[in-house]
UniProtKB/Swiss-Prot annotation:
GO molecular function annotation: mRNA 5'-diphosphatase activity
InterPro entries: Nudix_hydrolase, NUDIX_hydrolase-like_dom_sf, NUDIX_hydrolase_CS, NUDIX_hydrolase_dom, RppH
Organism: Escherichia fergusonii (strain ATCC 35469 / DSM 13698 / CCUG 18766 / IAM 14443 / JCM 21226 / LMG 7866 / NBRC 102419 / NCTC 12128 / CDC 0568-73)
EC number: 3.6.1.-
HAMAP family reported in the protein's UniProt record: Nudix_RppH
Keyword terms, alphabetized: Hydrolase
Domain spans labelled Nudix hydrolase: 6-149
Protein name according to UniProt: RNA pyrophosphohydrolase
SUPFAM superfamilies to which the protein is assigned, alphabetical: Nudix (SSF55811)
Superkingdom of source: Bacteria
The family this protein is said to belong to: Belongs to the Nudix hydrolase family. RppH subfamily.
GO biological-process terms attached to the record: mRNA catabolic process
Cofactors (names): a divalent metal cation
Length: 176
């Protein structure tokens, strides 16, 4: 399903943990990393597509996450000319994306990249919040920057609410 401007509707998923780190996934058989994302099927809402992609790509279900936020607007990126499939109709020149910020509520062990016969990813790791903006493929960088900027206050508030261990330098004990 491609819109009149040549953009394929898509969802992007940022999964964070309680420490404010985000899940960074390695594309299957490649050296490139990105957030989970995928197309919206006809008749499917963006949220329904997000849950479907979440399971297909990283093996998580509704019970494993909670939605913290979604982008206010659709964000677009154009594919480099070398990646456009000019011989298919209609021609897709890029993606328009609705992004979701999720908090992982279950254990890391629930993440499973092998739920599909053709997995999208073959590895993952937790990275610092802004790391993906510098590391993603260049044609997605502006969208990633905008997504992370929009979600930053939510993730930082989540971090601020995480209990600090007593031996942490951030923990201050009142002196009598």
């Amino acid at each position: 399903m491609i819109d009149d401007d040549g953009y394929r509707p898509n969802v992007g998923i940022v999964i964070c943990n309680r420490q404010g780190q985000v899940m960074w996934a390695r594309r299957y058989g490649q050296h490139s990393w990105q957030f989970p994302q995928g197309g919206i099927n006809p008749g499917e809402s963006a949220e329904q597509a997000m849950y479907r992609e979440l399971f297909e790509e990283v093996g998580l279900s509704r019970k494993d996450v909670r939605i913290l936020a979604s982008t206010r607007n659709w964000l677009r990126y154009k594919l480099p000319k070398r990646l456009v499939r000019w011989d298919t109709k209609p021609v897709c020149i890029g993606q328009k994306q609705k992004w979701f910020l999720l908090q992982l509520m279950s254990a890391d062990a629930e993440i499973n990249m092998q739920t599909s016969s053709t997995p999208e990813f073959d590895g993952w790791r937790w990275v610092s919040y802004w790391y993906p903006v510098r590391q993603v493929v260049s044609f997605k960088r502006d969208v990633y920057r905008r997504v992370m900027k929009e979600f930053a206050s939510v993730v930082m508030a989540l971090q601020d609410n995480t209990p600090k261990p007593q031996n942490s330098p951030a923990y201050r004990r009142k002196r009598g």
